[in-house]
Amino acid sequence: MSSSYWSETSSSSCGTQLPEVLQCQPQHYHCYHQSSQAQQPPEKNVVYERVRTYSGPMNKVVQALDPFNSREVLSPLKTTSSYQNLVWSDHSQELHSPTLKISTCAPSTLHITQNTEQELHSPTVKVTTYPQTTIRKYVVQNPEQEPLSQFLRGSQFFPGNNVIYEKTIRKVEKLNTDQGCHPQAQCHHHIVQQPQVIRSAHWQQPDSSQQIQAITGNDPISTHIGNELCHSGSSQIHEQVIIQDDGPEKLDPRYFGELLADLSRKNTDLYHCLLEHLQRIGGSKQDFESTDESEDIKSLIPKGLSEFTKQQIRYILQMRGMSDKSLRLVLSTFSNIREELGHLQNDLTSLENDKMRLEKDLSFKETQLKEYEELLASVRANNHQQQQGLQDSSSKCQALEENNLSLRHTLSDMEYRLKELEYCKRNLEQENQNLRMQVSETCTGPMLQAKMDEIGNHYTEMVKNLRMEEDREICRLRSQLNQYHKDVSKREGSCSDFQFKLHELTSLLEEKDSLIKRQSEELSKLRQEIYSSHNQPSTGGRTTITTKKYRTQYPILGLLYDDYEYIPPGSETQTIVIEKTEDKYTCP
């Protein structure tokens, strides 16, 4: 529960008259309202009250600020707005006021008139129109719920679900306090605009009934409400209360001045706070302070007013100027911030674009790096294989070079030996030729011829053996050379294979040539012998013994002759002599 509003005014003429009390018993409860001021001389027949109304979501109660039925003169401390005195009364309590008294009465009708000049002629109370009035609202809803405020806990709440709107006045003129109340109650209000019924609520008790109507006006200056309260089963006493409102309600000028001063200070503090925050974010004071000070506050204050009113107007003008400065400051700050936010948004967009481009470049470079790493790994593997193959080929080349050098040395030695053999052969042939010449000069006969043939055959056989050895050596060297070429040609491909085959064929061809040469030499020798034998004079018949030397490791030769004996292959040779008898016949 919170305080809804202050309902408190001051009168130009206030006194220390004992406060009278307005007693209400609509639902067996009493609310007391008092108001007192101790600054002006007392005025006769006037009732003063000071109240505070608390409103909440469930109920609304009234708090009296002055002690009930106080006879003492209130001090200025107690008349201030901070002084409070909450008074509650039991429903059984009954207060008697010589001025105003509202007791239980039968339900009656509430009369509202538009004429403010009308006066109710009552012997008890005369109500005149005063310019200062106020509105008091008493709202009670759901009284079963316990109040939330610590000031109201433990107090007696009002039963029922009634909403009561009551309007009282500040000044009531007391005519005659000794007379009784008339059983009719009327309330006259001055309503500027047409009244409008807002809300009405009904509440019934087992032994009584009561109807309460809430009426208010649309005028923002004053609100006019009248209530008829009262009902009692045992008492039929009626009292008449006439409430008339004619002027607008006014607040305390001191409270209003303090409020304006507080608002001016808060507005100035807000402006300085905004300026400080603006300087923190990089703005300058000269850019946002208004330089137009031509408007003079004093010239705007009308003359003929009190100093208090002038001070209030000055506060209002200062607050207006400070509000304009704060507004310009906020607008310029927001424009600068909007511009900076635009720049930051553009920078952020460019940075995001750069980020996306860099991410794309990074992904592309990562793929390139992976491909480069794979390529580098394959190149390293190939390089390792090539280095290994190069080492193997270099070792093979080194071995082949060594073999080539050794073969060259051997070939040079063989050539040198071959030259020596050829030189020996020429010497032997020369010697043979000389011997033949000597033999031909000395003697001619079959024995000599046989001797010469034997020597010639011996030398021929020696030459053949030498040639065969030389051929074998040459073949061996050629085979080694071919093997070397084979090893070299394995790396060169099919061309080397053809070259190797060509070398083999050339070697075979050379062997065949050498064999043909030997056979041709033997054939030429045989022809020469036959020719020489034909040139000699014949005597009857001559027997020629041809001696040939065969190797006996061929058993197939036994098929040709009956007397052939097989000799196992070995290093020994056997000479077969064939005698041939020639008979020469002469023609007659």
UniProtKB/Swiss-Prot annotation:
Keywords: Actin-binding, Cell junction, Coiled coil, Tight junction. Residues 332-442, 502-530 form a coiled coil. GO terms for molecular function: actin filament binding. InterPro entries: POF1B (IPR026186), POF1B_HlH (IPR056240). It holds the Pfam family POF1B_HlH. Transmembrane segments: none annotated. One of its GO terms (biological process) is epithelial cell morphogenesis. The keyword Zinc-finger does not apply. GO terms for cellular component: actin filament; adherens junction; bicellular tight junction. It is found in: Cell junction, Tight junction. It comes from the Eukaryota. Signal peptide: none annotated. Plays a key role in the organization of epithelial monolayers by regulating the actin cytoskeleton. May be involved in ovary development. Interacts with nonmuscle actin. This is Protein POF1B. It comes from Pongo abelii (Sumatran orangutan). The lineage of its organism: Eukaryota, Metazoa, Chordata, Craniata, Vertebrata.
